[in-house]
């Protein structure tokens, strides 16, 4: 047994059990989505950096969300594309651990950033006269750093619990990336502590932040209904709708994965939900939350106009 435990240093990601033609089709589609993700979020980062009119708390947090979305895609998609072309290409033990750690880090960070963005919107709509006094740059930087730091620290806990586990079972991971629960199934030791920590982290990451978001939006809705100007009211509703779409995509997939009903093959369901979460969410977020914003669109038009003139 000891020899088996120490001999496994590489693992195979089985990905999608489809034929070669479907694999090539998926490779083309996922490559296209990956490019759109990098292009959309990269555009948001570039526009916010270039235009001083976008140097405001709202766009500061949007830029961090764009960074998380790029990181999400870069952590999972390149390896997934390699596996579609070369299904037998293994991933190293260190690579597996790093991918698991980074995915958890980005998930927790995005969860907290969505809470911070909801709070920023709450202050902007419910306390507009005090907005600049409350959302100072010091507060904004503190909130962003706290989100990233919490994501790293919570993921380190999972990593510390995962590293000592021996792996002596067949080194095949039935997933398109090293998702922590899929990795735990390969361990030949008791993993109840690890699984309970993952469950506790998922529940606390859903219930606490989502409750805060719901309370924030209830206050926001009450404040919007009291606005006299129809134009201001419409603009506030549009901003809230964009944010709620992003929140719905993130928390919707997470809730279905962890607390939703199971039909058919739960493992396959979870795998495809995680695909949506790590590939489609990052691609859709800039379209929903940023590129529909009038100030961002105006900046994009100005940049494109300058490029055409040159």
From Swiss-Prot:
Keyword check for Transit peptide: no
Upper classification of the organism: Eukaryota, Metazoa, Chordata, Craniata, Vertebrata
Organism: Homo sapiens (Human)
Family listed: Belongs to the G-protein coupled receptor 1 family.
Name the UniProt record assigns to this protein: Olfactory receptor 2A7
Bridged cysteine pairs (disulfide): none
Main location: membrane
GO molecular function: G protein-coupled receptor activity; odorant binding; olfactory receptor activity
Topology Cytoplasmic: residue spans: 49-56, 120-138, 219-235, 292-310
Domain of life from the UniProt record: Eukaryota
Database matches in Pfam families: 7tm_4 (PF13853)
